[in-house]
């Protein structure tokens, strides 16, 4: 490969049975003409930051903790598609996205979120740097869905444009609650109103990226 520099973590292992380490790599540096740069481990709250920890926290719904680890919120990107439009009937319209294949999703529940419209098929250029605030539900929507299909629905605050067919990025900031089945649409509407206020309080705080 004729590499000039080889950058590895301090616990780097390679080769058969992972017997090679940083010292092994350095022992070949002069022969093959490269320099070894070792990156120290990063820690957060006395825990080493790693892809394993990040995946674990996401799978447990702790999306807030991974923001400083990733340097950004964990996000989902996809095209806005037509749904059942039940949200609109209760006064809380949502932008629906299809799940991405091989994407790690947090557990079913409601999340405070930020939204960016990346590009549009019908309205021309969008500003990908403009951020909207909202609330996102991930799950099978048990109150109105009897098929158990995974859904991703986002209510964008103070937003009434038609964005069907456009590509959006949804950034998950914090889990508000787990998914729950309600006895009626009125109960769902009341809970969503509370969730929206909770999301607004969460999003009013500064999102820390260390």
Regions found by a protein language model. Give the residues of each.
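Classical nucleotidyltransferase
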Residues: 1-93, 183-189, 196
